[in-house]
C-alpha cells in the first residue's frame, strides 16, 4: 500500500480547507480506507478540529518531524502521530511550524522536507491528506511538492478568479520544477447558499472559466451553521449532524474522489496493456 497524497489548498482563508480535510479524511476512513491527515498550518486548525484545543502543549508535531529530516536524524516509527476515534491518524501542528517555515528558507532541498517525512509513513496508509495554510509560502510549496493531487475548496460567495489564477500559477511552477506528477483533482464549491442565485452564478462562472482545464466537482458543500459548530467539538460532521446536508455533501465528495481514483487506475491499466 502506497498512499495517495492529496493537498487541500487555497491561499485564501475561510474557504473550508480544514473542514474539507477533516470530513473527506473521515469520509474515506468510513469507506474502509487507512487515512492519515497532516496539519500543515501553524495555527493548528486541523489539530483543534480533531479534538486538541491546545496544540501548543503537544510535545511532538509536524515541526519536530520536519526538524528531524532537516538534521538528517531518524524519526522513531509512529512518533507524534495521534489517533482520532473516527478512524484516522494525524500529525498535529502548532505555532512552532512558523519557525520551521523560516528555517526552511536556507535549508538544502527546502521544498521537499515534508515529502521526505511523508516517505517514512506512506506505506502504512491508503490516503494522506494535507491541510495547507492560506498562503503560497514555503509550507504550501512543500505540501504541493509532496502531493500527487490537489483539491481546491472555493467559497461560493465571492468571485474567486484572481486568487485561483495565482494558485494555479504556483501549482504549474511546482509541477514543472519539483513534482511532475502533480495534478488538480478539482475545485470544490463550499459554503453554497442555494437560496440565492449568486452561488449558481459562481458555479457557472467557474465551470465556464476553468471547466476545460480543471474539473469542478459535482458535489457541493452547503452553507450551514451546524458545520461551523463542529470544529469546537472534535468530531466530524458525520457524527455531529449525520442526516444534515453538509454530511450528505461530504459523503458525495468522498464517493466522487474514490470514483476518480478508480477511473485513473483503469486508465493506467488500459495504457499499460
Language-model-derived ranges and their functions:
Residues 1-273:
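P-loop NTP-binding core
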Amino acid at each position: 500500500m502506497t498512499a495517495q497524497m492529496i493537498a487541500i489548498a487555497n491561499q485564501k482563508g475561510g474557504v473550508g480547507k480544514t473542514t474539507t480535510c477533516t470530513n473527506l479524511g473521515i469520509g474515506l476512513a468510513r469507506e474502509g480506507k487507512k487515512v492519515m491527515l497532516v496539519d500543515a498550518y501553524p495555527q493548528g486548525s486541523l489539530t483543534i478540529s480533531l479534538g486538541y484545543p491546545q496544540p501548543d502543549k503537544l510535545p511532538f508535531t509536524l515541526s519536530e518531524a520536519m526538524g528531524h529530516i532537516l538534521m538528517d536524524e531518524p524519526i522513531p516509527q509512529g512518533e507524534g502521530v495521534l489517533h482520532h476515534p473516527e478512524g484516522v491518524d494525524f500529525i498535529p501542528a502548532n505555532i512552532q511550524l512558523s519557525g520551521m517555515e523560516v528555517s526552511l528558507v536556507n535549508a538544502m532541498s527546502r521544498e521537499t522536507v515534508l515529502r521526505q517525512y511523508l516517505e517514512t509513513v506512506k506505506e502504512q496508509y491508503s490516503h494522506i491528506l494535507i491541510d495547507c495554510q492560506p498562503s503560497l509560502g514555503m509550507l504550501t510549496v512543500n505540501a504541493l511538492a509532496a502531493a500527487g493531487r490537489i483539491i481546491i475548496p472555493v467559497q461560493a460567495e465571492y468571485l474567486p478568479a484572481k486568487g485561483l489564477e495565482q494558485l494555479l500559477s504556483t501549482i504549474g511552477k511546482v509541477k514543472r520544477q519539483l513534482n511532475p506528477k502533480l495534478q488538480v483533482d478539482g475545485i470544490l464549491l463550499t459554503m453554497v447558499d442555494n437560496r440565492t442565485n449568486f452561488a449558481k452564478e459562481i458555479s457557472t462562472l467557474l465551470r465556464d472559466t476553468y471547466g476545460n482545464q480543471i474539473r469542478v466537482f459535482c458535489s457541493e458543500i452547503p452553507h450551514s451553521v451546524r458545520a461551523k459548530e463542529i470544529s469546537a467539538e472534535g468530531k466530524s460532521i458525520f457524527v455531529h449532524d449525520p442526516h444534515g446536508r453538509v454530511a450528505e455533501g461530504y459523503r458525495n465528495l468522498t464517493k466522487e474522489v474514490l470514483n476518480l481514483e478508480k477511473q485513473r487506475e483503469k486508465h493506467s491499466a488500459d495504457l499499460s496493456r
